[in-house]
Protein backbone atom coordinates (compact mmCIF):
# COMPACT_ATOMS: atom_id res chain seq x y z
CA UNK A 1 0.00 0.00 0.00
CA UNK A 2 2.81 2.42 0.85
CA UNK A 3 4.50 1.86 -2.49
CA UNK A 4 1.33 2.22 -4.55
CA UNK A 5 0.56 5.56 -2.92
CA UNK A 6 4.12 6.71 -3.55
CA UNK A 7 3.97 5.71 -7.21
CA UNK A 8 0.51 7.23 -7.63
CA UNK A 9 1.75 10.56 -6.27
CA UNK A 10 4.64 10.67 -8.72
CA UNK A 11 2.45 9.71 -11.68
CA UNK A 12 0.10 12.59 -10.89
CA UNK A 13 2.40 15.33 -9.61
CA UNK A 14 5.92 14.57 -10.85
CA UNK A 15 5.76 12.52 -14.05
CA UNK A 16 9.20 13.76 -15.10
CA UNK A 17 10.81 11.48 -12.48
CA UNK A 18 11.83 7.96 -13.42
CA UNK A 19 10.92 5.52 -10.68
CA UNK A 20 12.98 2.36 -10.41
CA UNK A 21 11.35 -0.95 -9.70
CA UNK A 22 11.12 -1.70 -5.98
CA UNK A 23 13.56 -4.10 -4.40
CA UNK A 24 12.61 -6.36 -1.53
CA UNK A 25 14.62 -6.22 1.66
CA UNK A 26 12.71 -9.09 3.28
CA UNK A 27 12.55 -6.81 6.33
CA UNK A 28 16.26 -7.51 6.93
CA UNK A 29 18.78 -4.73 7.58
CA UNK A 30 21.67 -6.64 5.98
CA UNK A 31 19.67 -7.15 2.78
CA UNK A 32 18.57 -3.50 2.78
CA UNK A 33 22.18 -2.38 3.17
CA UNK A 34 23.28 -4.55 0.24
CA UNK A 35 20.38 -3.42 -1.96
CA UNK A 36 21.03 0.25 -1.14
CA UNK A 37 24.73 -0.14 -1.93
CA UNK A 38 23.78 -1.71 -5.27
CA UNK A 39 21.31 1.09 -6.07
CA UNK A 40 23.92 3.73 -5.26
CA UNK A 41 26.53 1.95 -7.39
CA UNK A 42 24.27 1.19 -10.37
CA UNK A 43 22.35 4.48 -10.46
CA UNK A 44 24.82 7.31 -9.97
CA UNK A 45 22.10 9.84 -10.83
CA UNK A 46 19.80 8.63 -8.05
CA UNK A 47 18.10 11.63 -6.46
CA UNK A 48 15.98 9.96 -3.82
CA UNK A 49 15.28 6.80 -1.90
CA UNK A 50 12.01 5.67 -0.34
CA UNK A 51 12.29 2.91 2.24
CA UNK A 52 8.71 1.89 2.92
CA UNK A 53 9.29 -1.18 5.02
CA UNK A 54 11.81 -2.90 7.23
CA UNK A 55 15.55 -2.70 6.90
CA UNK A 56 15.85 1.05 7.34
CA UNK A 57 18.94 0.66 9.56
CA UNK A 58 20.73 -1.14 6.73
CA UNK A 59 19.73 1.46 4.16
CA UNK A 60 20.95 4.23 6.45
CA UNK A 61 24.23 2.41 7.07
CA UNK A 62 24.80 2.13 3.30
CA UNK A 63 24.09 5.83 2.81
CA UNK A 64 26.50 6.79 5.56
CA UNK A 65 29.31 4.44 4.53
CA UNK A 66 29.07 5.50 0.88
CA UNK A 67 29.27 9.19 1.72
CA UNK A 68 25.79 9.76 0.26
CA UNK A 69 24.14 10.66 3.57
CA UNK A 70 22.61 14.11 3.17
CA UNK A 71 23.06 14.10 -0.62
CA UNK A 72 19.82 12.30 -1.49
CA UNK A 73 16.23 12.89 -0.54
CA UNK A 74 15.51 9.94 1.73
CA UNK A 75 12.00 9.16 2.90
CA UNK A 76 11.27 6.47 5.46
CA UNK A 77 8.32 5.10 7.27
CA UNK A 78 7.61 5.31 11.00
CA UNK A 79 9.31 7.58 13.49
CA UNK A 80 11.52 5.57 15.83
CA UNK A 81 14.92 6.24 17.40
CA UNK A 82 16.93 5.26 14.30
CA UNK A 83 14.83 7.38 11.93
CA UNK A 84 14.74 10.28 14.39
CA UNK A 85 18.54 10.23 14.58
CA UNK A 86 18.78 10.04 10.79
CA UNK A 87 16.50 13.07 10.43
CA UNK A 88 18.57 15.01 12.94
CA UNK A 89 21.91 14.20 11.29
CA UNK A 90 20.57 14.89 7.78
CA UNK A 91 20.72 11.33 6.46
CA UNK A 92 16.94 11.31 6.06
CA UNK A 93 14.74 14.05 4.67
CA UNK A 94 11.29 12.96 5.76
CA UNK A 95 9.53 10.31 7.83
CA UNK A 96 5.91 9.34 7.26
CA UNK A 97 4.47 7.89 10.43
CA UNK A 98 1.08 6.34 11.13
CA UNK A 99 -0.68 7.75 14.19
CA UNK A 100 -0.52 4.43 16.05
CA UNK A 101 -2.42 5.40 19.23
CA UNK A 102 -5.29 6.89 17.19
CA UNK A 103 -5.21 3.93 14.82
CA UNK A 104 -5.49 1.49 17.74
CA UNK A 105 -8.35 3.49 19.26
CA UNK A 106 -10.25 3.56 15.96
CA UNK A 107 -9.72 -0.19 15.47
CA UNK A 108 -11.02 -1.02 18.96
CA UNK A 109 -14.05 1.23 18.48
CA UNK A 110 -14.76 -0.49 15.18
CA UNK A 111 -14.55 -3.94 16.77
CA UNK A 112 -16.86 -2.89 19.60
CA UNK A 113 -19.35 -1.49 17.09
CA UNK A 114 -19.19 -4.69 15.04
CA UNK A 115 -20.25 -6.86 17.97
CA UNK A 116 -22.76 -4.44 19.46
CA UNK A 117 -26.52 -4.95 19.19
CA UNK A 118 -26.98 -1.68 17.35
CA UNK A 119 -27.66 -2.51 13.69
CA UNK A 120 -26.42 0.92 12.55
CA UNK A 121 -23.12 0.33 14.30
CA UNK A 122 -22.70 -2.94 12.42
CA UNK A 123 -22.61 -1.13 9.09
CA UNK A 124 -19.20 -0.97 7.51
CA UNK A 125 -17.41 2.21 8.47
CA UNK A 126 -14.22 3.75 7.26
CA UNK A 127 -12.08 5.96 9.43
CA UNK A 128 -9.49 8.12 7.75
CA UNK A 129 -6.58 9.10 9.94
CA UNK A 130 -3.98 11.56 8.67
CA UNK A 131 -0.40 10.37 8.79
CA UNK A 132 2.17 12.36 10.71
CA UNK A 133 5.02 13.84 8.70
CA UNK A 134 8.35 14.52 10.36
CA UNK A 135 11.32 16.52 9.16
CA UNK A 136 14.45 17.64 10.91
CA UNK A 137 12.78 20.97 11.64
CA UNK A 138 9.66 19.69 13.41
CA UNK A 139 11.09 17.10 15.79
What residue spans do the PLM features occupy?
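Hinge/cleft segment of the Venus flytrap/periplasmic-binding protein
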Residues: 99-139
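Short beta-strand elements at the ligand-binding edges of bilobed clamshell
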Residues: 89-101
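Short, well-ordered coil/turn elements that cap or connect secondary structure elements
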Residues: 14-17, 69, 89-90, 128
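Short, solvent-exposed amphipathic alpha-helices that sit
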Residues: 1-16, 31, 35, 58, ...
Amino acid sequence: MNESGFRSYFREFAPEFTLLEPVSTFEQSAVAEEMTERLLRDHRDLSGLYVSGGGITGALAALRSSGMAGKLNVVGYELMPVTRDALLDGTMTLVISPPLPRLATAAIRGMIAAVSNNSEAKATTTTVLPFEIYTRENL
